[in-house]
Swiss-Prot record:
It comes from Listeria innocua serovar 6a (strain ATCC BAA-680 / CLIP 11262). This is UPF0358 protein lin1058. Transmembrane segments: none annotated. HAMAP family: UPF0358. InterPro entries: UPF0358 (IPR009983), UPF0358_sf (IPR036270). Signal peptide: none annotated. Belongs to the UPF0358 family. Disulfide bonds: none annotated. It comes from the Bacteria.
């Protein structure tokens, strides 16, 4: 039984990481092709995606699939990557 829980924990972390990567890719495409970071549509998409990921993390935490610190680390890492992407985008324009 313990092995099954460990497998689910690892699977949960991997799925959350995939979702974070998907958000980063979505924002990158949006910055490259569609809008400027100051655009309300850009901010709305980013806020919505980050909120959705935070709810997924909260759900996984409540189920005991991940530790709260793992969730915080995932959000923090994504925020840093998005910030670097934003800075890169602004330096190109």
């Amino acid at each position: 039984m313990a092995n099954k829980k460990i497998d689910h924990r690892e699977e949960a972390i991997e799925l959350l990481k995939q979702d974070a990567k998907r958000i980063l890719q979505l924002i990158k495409v949006q910055m490259d092709n569609l809008t400027l970071p100051q655009c309300p549509a850009y901010e709305e998409v980013l806020d919505t995606q980050m909120y959705g990921l935070s709810r997924e993390i909260n759900f996984a935490t409540r189920l005991g699939l991940i530790e709260p610190e793992e969730g915080k680390k995932l959000i923090s890492t994504l925020e840093k990557e998005l910030s670097a992407l934003h800075e890169l985008s602004m330096s190109k324009k």
